[in-house]
């Protein structure tokens, strides 16, 4: 059995660790709420752009933009969103496992995969894994802006425009609630055909006056739409990261508390054994006299 001094040292060490995990839990909770606010604020923008695209596509069906046109998949691309830091449970691992399964399915069809990485964890993992990485963006912080993503996303959009990639997907963690984060793989390009389907409300073919031309507006709006979806995925992944970290740090704090209780019990037993031994020695010495 360890001595009382050693056990006291362990108790002090675990208590210090518990203070750190509790502080990290509170910081993660605060950052999660801020990320949720950004996540909710970005949704109306994406929804409004989607409506504009839908209207433009229906009112000008003679213009077949490449982003709205489906073609045979000879090569696919994935924009992968992960965290820059760890200590967030199995958040990244679950996403990577889902991705590897999907990538394996494409590989079995003889379709190569190209990757665009957002986040240090995905960058490290897929460089070890041996994936073909076309672009990357890391260390964006807890409050990224759309401008931080434009250059990285443009690489994949150019690849799609030039025919080097025939499908483009976004892989990120979807925020369900504080306790649940779900890996999600969402198709970005070609944009869902439902966007171009005829709507009964637009049968009368009313339209806006565009400056510049509707074709140029659609070209720009489609790019902004994809950028907004990627940004939405990034801020949602940050909310997932902070929620997972908060839960992980709470579990660590609780485990530290249980460990401290066990160590305290061991210390009490060691102290009791030492007192009993001293009493036995005193009694033995008195009997010898």
From Swiss-Prot:
PROSITE patterns linked:
ATPASE_GAMMA (PS00153)
Q: Where found?
A: Cell inner membrane
**Is Membrane one of the keywords UniProt gives this record?**
yes
Which keywords does UniProt give here?
A: ATP synthesis, Cell inner membrane, Cell membrane, CF(1), Hydrogen ion transport, Ion transport, Membrane, Transport
- Any one annotated GO CC term: plasma membrane
Membrane topology field: Peripheral membrane protein
Q: What GO terms are given for molecular function? A: ATP binding; proton-transporting ATP synthase activity, rotational mechanism
Q: Which InterPro entries match?
A: ATP_synth_F1_ATPase_gsu, ATP_synth_F1_gsu, ATP_synth_F1_gsu_CS
**Record GO biological process:** proton motive force-driven plasma membrane ATP synthesis
Q: Which family does it belong to?
A: Belongs to the ATPase gamma chain family.
Q: What does this protein do?
A: Produces ATP from ADP in the presence of a proton gradient across the membrane. The gamma chain is believed to be important in regulating ATPase activity and the flow of protons through the CF(0) complex.
Subunit structure, as described in the record: F-type ATPases have 2 components, CF(1) - the catalytic core - and CF(0) - the membrane proton channel. CF(1) has five subunits: alpha(3), beta(3), gamma(1), delta(1), epsilon(1). CF(0) has three main subunits: a, b and c.
Q: What is this protein called?
A: ATP synthase gamma chain
* Species name: Nitrosococcus oceani (strain ATCC 19707 / BCRC 17464 / JCM 30415 / NCIMB 11848 / C-107)
Q: What gene does the UniProt entry assign to this protein?
A: atpG
């Amino acid at each position: 059995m360890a001595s009382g001094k050693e056990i006291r040292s362990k108790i002090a060490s675990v208590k210090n660790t518990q203070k750190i995990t509790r502080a990290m839990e509170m910081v993660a909770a605060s950052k999660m709420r801020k990320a949720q606010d950004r996540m909710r604020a970005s949704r109306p923008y994406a929804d409004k752009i989607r409506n504009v695209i839908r209207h433009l596509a229906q009112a000008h069906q003679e213009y077949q933009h490449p982003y709205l046109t489906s073609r045979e998949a000879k090569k696919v691309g994935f924009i992968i969103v992960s965290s820059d830091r760890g200590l967030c449970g199995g958040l990244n691992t679950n996403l990577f496992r889902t991705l590897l399964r999907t990538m394996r399915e494409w590989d079995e069809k003889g379709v190569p995969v190209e990757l665009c990485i957002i986040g240090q964890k995905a960058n490290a993992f897929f460089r070890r894994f041996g994936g073909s990485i076309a672009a990357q963006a890391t260390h964006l912080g807890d409050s990224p802006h759309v401008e931080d993503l434009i250059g990285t996303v443009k690489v994949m959009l150019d690849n799609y425009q030039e025919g080097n990639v025939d499908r483009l997907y976004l892989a990120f963690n979807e925020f369900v609630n504080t306790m649940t984060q779900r890996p999600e793989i969402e198709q970005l390009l070609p944009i869902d055909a439902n966007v171009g389907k005829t709507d009964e409300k637009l049968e009368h073919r009313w339209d806006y006056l565009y400056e510049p031309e509707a074709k140029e507006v659609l070209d720009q709006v489609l790019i902004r739409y994809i950028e907004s979806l990627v940004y939405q995925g990034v801020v949602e992944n940050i909310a997932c990261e902070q929620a997972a970290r908060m839960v992980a740090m709470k579990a660590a704090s609780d485990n530290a508390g249980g460990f401290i209780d066990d160590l305290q019990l061991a210390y009490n037993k060691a102290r009791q054994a030492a007192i009993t031994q001293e009493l036995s020695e005193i009694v033995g010495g008195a009997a010898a006299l």
